[in-house]
Amino acid sequence: MTCYKLSRRRDLFAFPYPLTVWRDPPRSVEVVRDFVESYDIRHIYTVGDVVTRNFLEYGLAPTSVAVDEKTRRGIKVEGLGLYKRVIRVNNPPGYITEEAWAAVEEAVEGGVLIKVDGEEDMLSLAFIKLAPPRSVVAYGHYLGALVAIPVDWYRDSILRLFNYLEQCQQKA
């Protein structure tokens, strides 16, 4: 099993990696849809309530999603019944716990809703590392942009962020 804790250089994790769309929905989702269609992307994974809601609302259903059901805007995500399997995990802020990592391992197969008690933000890294070829991982940037990572192009570069995480010990 794998567990990581953000220990330093939090600033690197706030960087808006490509493809960053500084448009409100539905336009932001349309940009990602165009990208997905143009590059024959087969899998889309969303991390975060607002991004997941926008993708579902504007007709771009993700393969699997991770949400914590808490947003600064008080938004409720509709349409989560689309996902056949629900996995509940504990994941404190700044962590990717063993159980969250295991949930992402299942989620990359498709049809999974990960409900996080804590914070889901760091799970984007697990999705980027574990996603199959022709995948995009999408999440919201704290300044309001939609970030979509085509993993085939950026996986190696983004995985260097693991150098700034420390492995954590958890009780089984």
Curated annotation (Swiss-Prot):
Pfam families in alphabetical order: DUF359
Catalytic activity: 3'-dephospho-CoA + GTP = GDP + CoA + H(+)
EC number(s) given by UniProt: 2.7.1.237
One GO term of the biological process aspect: coenzyme A biosynthetic process
Keywords tagged on the record: Coenzyme A biosynthesis, GTP-binding, Kinase, Nucleotide-binding, Transferase
GO molecular function: GTP binding; kinase activity
Disulfide pattern: none
Database matches in InterPro entries: GTP-dep_dephospho-CoA_kin
Pathway involvement of the protein, from the record: Cofactor biosynthesis; coenzyme A biosynthesis
Residue numbers binding GTP: 49-51, 68, 70, 120
Function: Catalyzes the GTP-dependent phosphorylation of the 3'-hydroxyl group of dephosphocoenzyme A to form coenzyme A (CoA).
Stated family: Belongs to the GTP-dependent DPCK family.
Protein name: GTP-dependent dephospho-CoA kinase
Record organism: Pyrobaculum arsenaticum (strain DSM 13514 / JCM 11321 / PZ6)
Taxonomic path: Archaea, Thermoproteota, Thermoprotei, Thermoproteales, Thermoproteaceae
